[in-house]
Each structure stands twice: as structure tokens, then as C-alpha cells.
Curated annotation (Swiss-Prot):
Component of numerous DCX (DDB1-CUL4-X-box) E3 ubiquitin-protein ligase complexes which consist of a core of DDB1, cullin-4 (CUL4A or CUL4B), DDA1 and RBX1. Belongs to the DDA1 family. This is DET1- and DDB1-associated protein 1. Keywords: Ubl conjugation pathway. Residues 67-104 are annotated as: Disordered. It comes from Danio rerio (Zebrafish).
Amino acid sequence: MDKADFLKGLPVYNKTNFSRFHADSVCKASNRRPSVYLPTREYPSEQIIVTEKTNILLRYLHQQWDKKNAAKKREQEQAEGEGGSPAPPRKIARTDSQEMNEDS
């Protein structure tokens, strides 16, 4: 099949785009050797590389938030220690579950 016959039925806006096509000018395989990574350090073969599942942006924002709030946490802990009585625990034991166990 000739190139002209192959390209004949294709819809085009400008036919001169295909008139300059030459198969010889298409990328030729070069004789250059491909670049290869050569490690500078020797790593153990049993080393396992694990990728983080969280997004880089989310991880960065969490780190910034932790840095920002670390000072606030320290201030609260110091204030509680100086005040004498520690704050009550945030979680309170459920009393209804004990009552349910007594009924059965």
C-alpha cells in the first residue's frame, strides 16, 4: 500500500501537512547508549521500600498543624500542672451497660 493511498481518505483541514511526509525522516534509532542509574551506595537487598499512602500535601498540612498546636498543648499541660487539680477525663464510663449486665 502506498503512503498516498493510505492517507487519501483521511479528513484534513490542510492537505499540505501530509504532502511533506517522508518515511525516512521519521525518528531513527540512534546508536547512543541509554542512560543508566549507577548507585553510589550499597543498600541491603532485603530492604523493603514502602510508599506513604497519604497525599504529600495532606501530610505537610498535618505536620504544620502539629507544629502550630504543639505549643498550645504544652501551655495547657503546664497550666493544669500548676493549677493543682487535673481536669476530669474526657471519657466517662457508661453506667447503663453495667445496669444491663445486672438485669440478665
